[in-house]
Curated annotation (Swiss-Prot):
Protein name (record): Regulator of G-protein signaling 8
One Gene Ontology term, aspect cellular component: neuronal cell body membrane
Subcellular location: Cell membrane; Membrane; Perikaryon; Cell projection, Dendrite
Keyword set, alphabetical order: Cell membrane, Cell projection, GTPase activation, Membrane, Nucleus, Phosphoprotein, Signal transduction inhibitor
GO terms classed as biological process: G protein-coupled acetylcholine receptor signaling pathway; G protein-coupled receptor signaling pathway; negative regulation of signal transduction; positive regulation of GTPase activity; regulation of dopamine receptor signaling pathway
Length: 180
């Protein structure tokens, strides 16, 4: 009933929220979570590109819409912190200022790695402690071990489920229909 009272301009937000509130296999309106305007983004996304995401996890991560689709899928599984951590590490590696490097390193650690972090990633004790030690003298590689573990976890666990998900299969179907 509350959805009926919302202004029309919020329809996109309702669609996104509705999509994310369901299990990944029940979300068929993938366009709602694309980073650009859905119709324009879907027109730019070729069937070939979306199909290539199945070639490897790294191919998926190298594509803007692949990351957006995978993020939306992970949200339905309540595990988007893994991708967010991986992306934060990638951005961290681009840091050139030593002062910013230190503050960013501590921010990433506190948000994702520390025990009881708000978006704590699932890594083992040894990796967590090695990362903590690396923060004593932060460098561009201080998160490499933890990032590698999270990458491996997503690649072996979440990525195969994403490729089998209705969300991904619907996206492929939509992009193929657009070509017809």
């Amino acid at each position: 009933m509350a959805a009926l009272l919302m202004p029309r301009r919020n329809k996109g937000m309702r669609t996104r929220l509705g999509c994310l509130s369901h299990k990944s296999d029940s979300c068929s309106d993938f366009t709602a979570i694309l980073p650009d305007k859905p119709n324009r983004a879907l027109k730019r996304l070729s069937t070939e590109e979306a199909t290539r995401w199945a070639d490897s996890f790294d191919v998926l991560l190298s594509h803007k819409y692949g990351v957006a689709a995978f993020r939306a899928f992970l949200k339905t599984e309540f595990s988007e912190e893994n991708l967010e951590f991986w992306l934060a590490c990638e951005e961290f590696k681009k840091t050139r200022s030593t002062a910013k490097l230190v503050s960013k390193a501590h921010r990433i650690f506190e948000e994702f790695v520390d025990v009881q972090a708000p978006r704590e990633v699932n890594i083992d004790f040894q990796t967590r402690e090695a990362t903590r030690k690396n923060l004593q003298e932060p460098s561009l590689t201080c998160f490499d071990q933890a990032q590698g573990k999270v990458h491996s976890l997503m690649e072996k666990d979440s990525y195969p489920r994403f490729l089998r998900s209705k969300m991904y299969l619907d996206l492929l179907s939509q992009s193929q229909r657009r070509l017809s």
